Amino acid sequence: MRGPLGAVIGRYTSSDGSAPNDGIIKHNRKCRDITFLIIFIAFWVSMIVNSSFGFNQGNPLRLTYGLDYEGNVCGSKHRHRDLTQLELRYWLNPNQVYESGLKDGELKLANARTICLLDCPAPSDDTLNWVCDYPDGEIRLKMNDWIDRNYDYFEFLTPEMRNSSLQLQGPCYPVIFPSVNVYWSCQYIARASNSSLRHWQQMGGVNIQEDMIIDKSIRRSMNSRASVLKRYVADIGKSWPVLIVCGGLVPLFLSIIWLLLIRHFVAAMPWITVVLFNMLLISVTVFYYLKAGWIGNDAVTPIIGEHDPYFHVYGRELTHVRGVAILMTFISVVAILTSIAIIRRILMATSVLKVAAKVIGEVQALIIFPAIPFAMLAIFYMFWISAALHLFSSGQVVQNNCNNTNCCAYDLVLKKVNCDRCCGYSIHYTPHITIAIFFHLFGCYWATQFFIASSATVIAGSVASYYWAQGEASPEIPFLPVFASMKRLARYNLGSVALGSLIVSFVESVRFILEAIRRKTKVSGTIPDHWFWRMAHYTSRGCLKSVEWTIKSVNRNAYIMIAITGKSFCKSSAIATELIISNILRIGKVNVIGDVILFLGKLCVSLFSALFGFLMLDSHRYRASHNKVSSPLLPVLACWALGYIVATLFFAVVEMSIDTIILSFCQDSEENQGNAQHAPPLLLETLDSNQEEEVQSLTH
């Protein structure tokens, strides 16, 4: 049998085998897993270097606004041209847009001539409106004067310029089709103005194609996966106040309230949590139905500002919202049925939570402590999100390769129609940028797991002090045990925490990569049809999920033993696993039911955050003008995820209290031949009743 745990309490030997010390968990420790601490520090240095690349090369405006024919980002100031006011991208030549929509067309929409405007032009009922190129050369107009003239200086053109304009080669182009602001690009409406078209034909202009293709070509470009991804990332940047309030302050407030309620109304909290969880889940589902357009008239729309109510444009974002609405419906049904199934076990969870509530009452600093990792995570997320926006927009603006004969346009500086280097510009992403983005995402997950693990270890050390002092005088508990536990963690065990969080992050990353490969093969139709390969495919997915869940569970218990014993991560994992296996009959259902209630509590906080996120995003600020989000989907999911992380930090007070007391109970029983000397009476009663149930179920 394994000997006594090192340095659990004064009467045990310390981890290095030295003589016992006086007091509770006062022991001589050694620095553990130093190699992984060095790796973690190197990782942080790499994160800073990686982020500095993004800050140096990126421009988040690229995620929202398009490029003009010179490669300038609309809505920003450039060396030779100030486009700060001009945020809308407009395609000057409707025939180029039409040709880009043809299956056998040589011209791509990215090479069609575009400029940046203040608003989308509209055709006139009694005359022909023009939109002219940026004033240059002989056109002696300032940009502000050009804007005030509604981009029209046709009257100043020479006969040569007018002739090239009638050939749709500029510098002025007719406004034949109405257009609407769709995600900061003027999308043509394939309904030509009869009056404008008649004036154009009377002036001798070339034939202009009228077809739905002119509408679909732009729409296809706006709904491409790359464009949708850019808009989703841009939504995070636009909704940063929502993330601060609903992803930070709201879950912080709700988590503290939940802990206080657990402290004073523990008997009612499991019931309140289950009922509230189902109500919130249904409420969030209803909001998704509203945004999907299945309830009311508030569906997600890509159109910005006022527009013709009879004109509708549907983006890919609406499809995504509807998909999530269906998923939430399924989850709600499963959640309600599961809640009904666990009603009989809620009383057992109440008993376990009462033990945790007593710990919180005795060590009151535990309620306040999670605010420290919360503040550190908040600072990290602010830096991380800002860096992510710059990394996602850090591609190089390069000119496309195209057939120059299709993009000829009048050059005001050269005073002639120019077909050289008239292709459009695109943002080119190199492979190293993709690697940098994935490294940044992995870094976020590892850092989050590290902060959560550190918080859990500190809480475990504090609760262990409480447990082992029950058989002795209360002065034996060190003053402010939370800070004593923090000191031990910072001095000896940061490497062990870094290793545990790295293992979880690595397994989760592998699962993510395999899932991405699965989706890609599914789309391309390369998934094998043979039943054996399909079975192997789904079995591997299930195994990875099981491995992930097991590792997270083992890690949590390892952090407890790290806090108690000061041993390395692997040794602590082995000790914790041995203790649990030896006492599985006594602690089996108790721990599971307690975890279920706490998990539902975290979901309550995160769903509240998502609900508040929906309400904030439904305000005028995020439905119109510059801050309009393409869809509430990603900001709401971000609020949900941040709310869950904040709740995890605070709920770890209860979660780790239960787990630490149970593991301490197991060790206490082992050290005292099956009779725990320091266990609270309520815990003994709960565990003994659970053991009787397990024995009865095995014998019948």
Swiss-Prot record:
Record carries keyword Protein transport: yes
Topological type in the membrane: Multi-pass membrane protein
Keywords in alphabetical order: Cell membrane, Cytoplasm, Cytoskeleton, Developmental protein, Endocytosis, Endosome, Glycoprotein, Golgi apparatus, Membrane, Protein transport, Transmembrane, Transmembrane helix, Transport
Residue ranges that the UniProt entry lists as topological domain Cytoplasmic: 1-33, 263-264, 344-364, 454-493, 617-633
Role noted for this protein: Regulator of vesicle trafficking, including endocytosis. Necessary for secondary plasmodesmata (PD) formation and development via the secretory trafficking regulation of proteins required for PD development, thus influencing intercellular communication. Modulates ion homeostasis, especially in roots, by monitoring the transport and subsequent subcellular localization of some ion transporters. Choline transporter involved in the regulation of choline metabolite homeostasis during root and phloem development. Modulates phloem morphogenesis and conductivity. (Microbial infection) Required for PD localization of MP17, the luteoviral movement protein.
Chain segments annotated as transmembrane: 34-54, 242-262, 265-285, 323-343, 365-385, 433-453, 494-514, 596-616, 634-654
Segments on the Extracellular side according to the record's topology features: 55-241, 286-322, 386-432, 515-595, 655-700
Null allele phenotype: Impaired plasmodesmata (PD) mediated cell-to-cell communication. Altered choline metabolite profile. Several phenotypic abnormalities (e.g. dwarf with defects in both shoot and root architecture), including reduced pore density and altered pore structure in the sieve areas, associated with defective symplastic transport through phloem. Increased number of sieve elements (SE)-like cells instead of two companion cells (CCs) and two SEs. Defects in procambium maintenance and phloem patterning. Abnormal retaining of desmotubules in the symplastic space in sieve pores.
Gene Ontology MF annotations: choline transmembrane transporter activity
Protein name in UniProt: Choline transporter protein 1
Stated consequence of mutating residue 247 to E: In cher1-5 and sic1; impaired secondary plasmodesmata (PD) formation (e.g. blocked or shrunken) and development leading to starch and soluble sugars excess accumulation, abnormal cell-to-cell communication, and stunted growth
Any Gene Ontology biological process: xylem and phloem pattern formation
InterPro entries with a match to the protein in the record: Choline_transptr-like
Expressing tissues: Expressed in both roots and shoots.
Origin species: Arabidopsis thaliana
Family statement drawn from the similarity comment of this UniProt entry: Belongs to the CTL (choline transporter-like) family.
Sites carrying sugar chains: 163, 194, 403
A GO CC annotation given for this chain: plant-type vacuole membrane
Compartments where located: Early endosome membrane; Golgi apparatus, trans-Golgi network membrane; Cytoplasm, Cytoskeleton, Phragmoplast; Prevacuolar compartment membrane
